[in-house]
From Swiss-Prot:
This is DNA ligase. The gene is ligA. It comes from Caulobacter sp. (strain K31). The active site is at 126 (n6-amp-lysine intermediate). Zn(2+) binds at residues 424, 426, 448, 454. CDD domains: BRCT_DNA_ligase_like, LIGANc. Pfam families: BRCT, DNA_ligase_aden, DNA_ligase_OB. It comes from the Bacteria. The lineage of its organism: Bacteria, Pseudomonadati, Pseudomonadota, Alphaproteobacteria, Caulobacterales.
Length: 792
């Protein structure tokens, strides 16, 4: 789907995208760390995480408790016993350019207050494999684990023992003690060499068995076998590069520590790590490893820089989920050439049209690619890609790979520019519309105007309706939903609940392949379980534009009532009243001008209502000056923006008069004034309920439901009105449960500690947030103390 620049996101759009990114990245973490079957490349994953961080940086108050920026890896799989790491296995922040690598060196210097003194780093190739931790006691391997979520991993000791590179007993020490710490966790990477990977896949293909997409998947799948004998048959290797818990220090520098690891019997990275100095050294070693990369026997995806001095590492400490003293410099995304065979259009839930390139299959970075996003019509025109072109494909930046551009010298004769359709690809062929922003500029997105009449939008609405954060109906997956939609059994959300009581259809379903008594009974049970549901999930499930999960909760709490379907009827009535009082187009255009805030907007509207004479100040030199005479309190940036927008006095005066006539009514203003709603969400809600077909489908749905009101936050508790931060590991409740509990008690839950924070609840592993709270003199309590205070 097309992507709005972070700088252009509204708060509502940012909140909705952060919600989507949290879900998407959690799913990718699960596929990568547990299922060993990632569906996107590392470059794509890094791009998603970077966009998440960029949005959080711009909207820090929207940082979610389940933010990917707070998480490492994924929870352990249930088939393996849990292992708690003595020291968490953290991930590294990334750098993607020379400038970012240089800035890393500058940050280190600023923190350590160094000016001209040299800073030394170890630079190691970043192996693309599966992280593992090995615990040795008195030199003997006693336990091995995967990273898991960084805190809890999976016990794969027996499997790791089968890898020849892993010593069962450390070398070079006295068995009675000495030579190595009594207790130490060695960290490293399990990987497979490219030649061994290719040989395994070739043999598996010939035998009709499963093949793997890339060496990393193969290594992970081979290590995480229930039967260690299978792991023993796989060509697994291990590089050691770090350590976690240790009972005593054993080195003064990272460089010295790597030497000790080799002395104890481990293989460290090849090409070997190098010790470099200052920013230029970081850039030089990166260039060297990039040249050597194609010659290596295994995959590397970058270079890891670590401050060499361990005392400096200790002083630098950690930020969030990563060490301040290390960073991973990633190689650029890999590219390939292929043929653009066709351009298809996909229709989203809100009617947005996304062009998708259909490509001649090509392997990029070990993954076969057949599709790539083209974002929108403007992007196709800008890149001038045409059907039949040879194009350069890059796996980075989007969930589906992207086309960098065409190879013009290979363009076939007769290739013509792509003409973006004017009508939806559905059988109704409804016209596509291109909307305008509040400031009057056209958006890049084209939308199908058919709304619920469009079958593509209807199925996307249904998918959203049954999604995990909406109705989350167990037993009704996308495949079943699509089949029921095609047959006409489910055309709108209400049909789902009608199906559960349609004995004729259920009887027919029991006779079908893949169903039977048990699966149909489970489907009915899943549907019936959602007849009673909270108002917030109902609002979110409707799939209104600009109304994400957070906004749905705000609305549900504001309109909560024991009557009228949990408050839904009150919400609908308020939206319908507001629908007749929406601001006019010229009002929105005027209000969207740069420098025009709410006060300036109101002053302009009042001036327009009073009527402006035709150029009452002809002696003025410019329109900006005339506007200043007409509305004296306007700022200079606002005057300049309005003068550029309207050009002359008559056009400006006419716009002001129209804006005055199009000013919104009181009911709309009340809806928009709800804390957390605002004008964009208010307009979306009002426009949704203004449509007769929406009201009809909503009426059908709520007739099937018992909607429960969402409890309004209390105002008479010990924490009402206070800002609270939860940090560290919570042992008696999840972060979501803690947040819900605090908000229900009238508190505001924040993700970072500041002077405005009233209370920090700190669990095991609390780091920088606890330190900041202590420095600021903010009250800190344990999870048990919190529960005792709130009566949990």
């Amino acid at each position: 789907m097309s992507q709005i620049a972070v700088a252009d996101l509204t708060e509502a759009q940012a909140a909705e995208e952060l919600e989507r990114l949290a879900d998407d990245l959690a799913a990718h973490d699960l596929r990568y760390h547990q299922q060993d079957a990632p569906t996107i490349s590392d470059a794509e994953y890094d791009a998603l995480k970077r966009r998440n961080l960029d949005i959080e940086d711009r909207f820090p108050h929207l940082v979610r408790d389940n933010s990917p920026s707070m998480r490492v890896g994924a929870a352990r799989a249930e088939q393996f016993s849990p292992v708690e790491h003595g020291v968490p296995m953290l991930s590294l922040d990334n750098a993607f350019s020379n400038d970012e690598a240089t800035e890393f060196d500058a940050r280190i210097r600023r923190f350590l207050r160094l000016t001209n003194e040299p800073v030394f780093y170890t630079a190691e190739p970043k192996i693309d494999g599966l992280s593992a931790s090995l615990r040795y006691e008195k030199g003997v391997l006693v336990q091995g684990a995967t990273r898991g979520d960084g805190r809890m991993g999976e016990d794969v000791t027996a499997n790791l023992r089968t890898i020849a590179d892993i010593p069962h007993r450390l070398r070079g020490g006295d068995p009675q003690g000495g030579g190595w710490p009594d207790v130490i966790e060695i960290r490293g990477e399990v990987y497979v060499e490219l030649e061994a990977f290719a040989a395994f896949n070739a043999a598996a293909l010939e035998a009709g068995q499963r093949t793997y997409a890339n060496p990393r998947n193969f290594a992970a799948g081979s290590l995480r076998q229930i039967d260690p004998k299978i792991s023993a048959q796989r060509p697994l290797r291990f590089f050691a590069y770090a350590w976690g818990l240790t009972s005593e220090g054993f080195a003064a520098t990272q460089w010295e520590a790597l030497g000790k690891l080799r002395d104890w019997g481990f293989v460290t990275t090849a090409p070997p790590a190098e010790r470099v100095q200052d920013a230029q050294g970081l850039l030089d070693i990166y260039a060297k490893f990039e040249v050597e990369r194609p010659k290596l026997a295994f995959d590397i995806d970058g270079v890891v820089y670590k401050v060499d001095d361990l005392e400096q590492q200790r002083r630098l400490g950690f930020v969030s989920r990563s060490p301040r003293w290390a960073i991973a410099r990633k190689f650029p995304a890999q590219q390939a050439r292929t043929i653009l065979e066709a351009i298809d259009l996909q229709v989203g839930r809100t009617g947005a049209i996304t062009p998708v390139a259909r490509l001649k299959p090509v392997t990029v970075g070990g993954v076969s690619v057949t599709n790539a996003t083209l974002h929108n019509a403007d992007e196709i025109a800008r890149k001038d890609v045409r059907i039949g072109d040879t194009v350069i494909l890059q796996r980075a930046g989007d969930v589906i790979p992207q086309i960098v551009g065409p190879v013009l010298e290979e363009r076939p004769a007769g290739a013509v520019p792509f003409e973006f359709p004017t009508h939806c690809p559905c059988h109704l062929e409804t016209p596509l519309v291109r909307e305008s922003t509040a400031a009057g500029a056209e958006t890049v997105v084209r939308r199908c105007s058919g709304e619920f009449a469009c079958p593509f939008q209807r199925i996307e609405h249904l998918r959203h309706f049954v999604s995990r954060r909406a109705f989350d109906i167990e037993g009704l997956g996308e495949k079943q939903l699509a089949a029921f939609f095609e047959e006409g059994w489910i055309k709108e959300p209400a049909d789902i609940f009608k199906l559960a009581r349609d004995e004729a259809k259920l009887a027919e379903l029991r006779e079908r392949d893949g169903y039977g008594e048990t699966s149909v009974a489970n489907l009915v049970k899943g549907i019936e379980a959602r007849r009673t549901i909270g108002l917030d999930r109902v609002i979110y499930g409707l799939g209104m534009r600009d109304i994400g999960e957070t906004t749905s909760t705000v609305l549900a709490r504001n309109f909560a009532s024991p009557k009228g379907k949990g408050g839904f009827e009150d919400l609908q009535a308020a939206a319908e009243r507001a629908a007749g009082q929406l601001p006019g187009a010229v009002y929105l255009e005027l209000a969207g001008a740069p420098g025009v805030g709410p006060k300036a907007r109101d002053e302009l509207v009042e001036a327009g209502k009073g009527g402006l004479k035709a150029d009452p100040w002809p002696e003025a030199d410019s329109l900006e000056v005339k506007i200043g005479h007409a509305v004296p309190k306007l700022s200079k940036p606002a005057r300049v923006a309005l003068a550029e927008r309207y050009g002359d006095w008559d056009t400006f005066a006419q716009a002001l008069a129209q804006a005055g006539q199009g000013a919104p009514g009181e009911d709309y203003l009340q809806l928009a004034a709800i804390d957390g709603i605002g004008p964009v969400a208010a307009q979306s809600i009002a426009r949704f309920f203004a449509e007769a077909h929406n009201r009809e489908k909503v009426a059908n749905l709520i007739a099937e439901l018992d909607i429960q009101p969402v409890a309004k936050p209390k105002t008479d508790t010990a924490v009402a009105g206070k800002t609270i931060v939860f940090t560290g590991a919570l042992e008696k409740m999840t972060r979501d449960e803690a947040k819900a509990q605090a908000e229900g008690l009238g508190a505001k839950v924040a993700s970072s500690v500041s002077k405005k924070t009233d209370l920090v609840v700190a669990g095991p592993g609390a780091g920088s947030k606890l330190k900041t709270a202590t420095e600021l003199g903010i009250q800190v309590m344990t999870e048990d103390e919190w529960l005792a205070m709130v009566g949990g």
